[in-house]
Amino acid sequence: DFNVEIVDQDLMRVMQTEINDVTKLPVQCKHGAIVKISNTRMSDEDDYYVQFNGENGKSGPGQWTEVAEPGIVKSLDATTMPHVLQRQSISGTNPVIFLAKKYEWEDRKVGDDVTNPIPSFVGEKINRVLFFRNRLVLLAGENVVTSRPGSIAKPNFWSDSALTVSAVDPIDISCASTYPSALFDAIEINTGLLCFSTNAQFLLSSDDTIMNPDTAKLRAVSWFNYNKVIPPISLGQTTGYIDNSNKYSRFMEMANIVREGEPAVVNTSKVVPTLLPKDIDLFTNSKENNIVLFGKTDSDTVIGFRYLNQADKRLQAAWFKWKFNNPLKYHFCIEDSYYLIDTDNFLQKVNLIQADADPSIDQDNTNYLIHLDNYTTVSGGTFASATNKTTFTNQSDWIDQVTSPNGKLVVVDTDPSTTREGRYAECTVINNDDFTIPGDWSREVTSITVTNGGSGYTSAPTVTISGGGGSAATATATIESGAVTAVTINNNGYNFTSVPTVAFSGGGGSSAAATAAIHTGEFNIGYLYDYQVDFPRFYLQKTSDDSVSSDINSKLTVHRMKLNFGKIGLYETTLTRVGKAAYTEIYESTDLDEYDASDAPYLDEKIKDIPVYERNLNVDVTLKSSHPAPATLRSMSWEGDWSPMHYRRV
């Protein structure tokens, strides 16, 4: 130890590791020297550290830069921080590969544990990772911690300087309240970041245009229960989430979320209080199609909610169920499609709106969608006239992929060039890779075109169709002015693999020629599935403003129902009556002798009367369709006798 005494401070200054005036820092010093600047003797909140960087890395002249306190923790442990799933570049025919790896996190470069403290998520469980206003956000405990904006490539949760507070500094804010308020999820809305705890909702927002540590506010906006397993979703104008605090789950919607004031929260599932099970853990939606889907792992049933909004009003809403052939493991929506992964690790896709690849029939300027599950196409069947069956072989590349189908396997012809458009038949699978269909589904002769009428014909010549691998095709020629003008097919034949030859003989003429065409299209094959509508109990209803009331005290006898269909084919109705056997009747949209044989028996709209004649309390009505044809129900009305029973309220 030694002492140094300075007579004139203008000539020499002495310091060790700490000074209280930054102006006393020398202009020349040892390279790498670190000095603590203690601005206020009784406070640590304005202290900071500087390091001398000599020119060319040598002691002597240089400059002082702000650094972190020596010996403190300066980095985050990447092994316990969130990892990333990074898609690798695709080369050639290689499949898409995702790489799971540790992420890079920015180190603390300035300050100490007081002026630039460790983020509050260190030592806590991180419940959620998301993005908000160009910042990476971590939810841990009761805190919302955001990185510096624009640092997604290498997130920075540290301040850039211990001297001042910057608008781009990270935000670390708590939502502490009188109730346990650990945050489990959040969703971005127009007014900020809506955060969810199990019994309250908080809004991270700012009164200023730019959100920074000084302007950020995290305050409670509502106090409702929340299922922490399922993330909230945006429905466009509202935010939806699940509450499972009771025996059944509830689907809640929150609207009008503002910085000041309470939002409007509605229990949307109140009309179906027992529909949603308590242990729902799968939740997705498609805003473009106004649909919300609820599922449960290892369950084969998905519950759906469909709604129609106009401006800020909900005009219509309905609940429904989908039943799949295997239980779910996960599901999600992308654009206009719903995807699910079942317990066989099979990815299935359901188009929420009609896609170009979906099988359909065009007729009278109207397109009719064909409804098949797990559909694909087949061709090249062989017809056996002895058994009147067509056999399709070598189908193992797709039949065994569909496990535990719910419905029957059927084939539908949607080719407009054939005379059997709209025809369908049930398949019988044999040996797990072949199947047979009743009737002739092989390639047939579809048309014959006269290319040379010839001359000198005094009677119709005989038409011979040969070759092409098929048989039994016959046709008749028509002559006019000594020439063949047309050929009419009497029998389309079967089992053609190539175009046959058409020849003319007899009739006294010569030189007539024609070419044939065969069916080269494919058939759509898939599994039938049930469409079912259970109508609610009928009551006389009265509408006043936006509310509807039902008269449940009066006597009502329903005479008939009127079902207003859009595109429709085959369907059935069942009346389940008290004290009587259930009555089921099958309806076809078109009657015999009212449509061409080559047309599909579908209509673009129809109103059908269903006889009932029962008291409303004694009958339940079900509409069902298991046919590939469409069955679009637009509305339902009823006619009947109503009597108030002379009741008067007192």
What are these regions (language model features)?
Residues 1, 33-57, 64-75, 81, ...:
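Ser/Thr/Gly-rich low-complexity blocks that favor extended beta-strand/coil architectures
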Residues 1-120:
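Long, charge-dense tracts
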Residues 4, 40, 84-86, 129, ...:
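Short, exposed beta-strand/loop patches in secreted or surface proteins that constitute
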Residues 44, 55-78, 95-100, 105-107, ...:
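Tryptophan-centered short beta-strand motifs
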Residues 65-73, 92-103, 107, 438-442, ...:
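Surface-exposed interaction regions enriched in Ser/Thr/Asp/Glu
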Residues 104-134, 139-290, 294-332:
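Beta-propeller and closely related beta-pinwheel folds
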Residues 247-442, 519-650:
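Beta-sheet repeat architectures centered on beta-propellers
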Residues 383, 440-519:
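Conserved, function-critical positions that sit in or immediately flank catalytic
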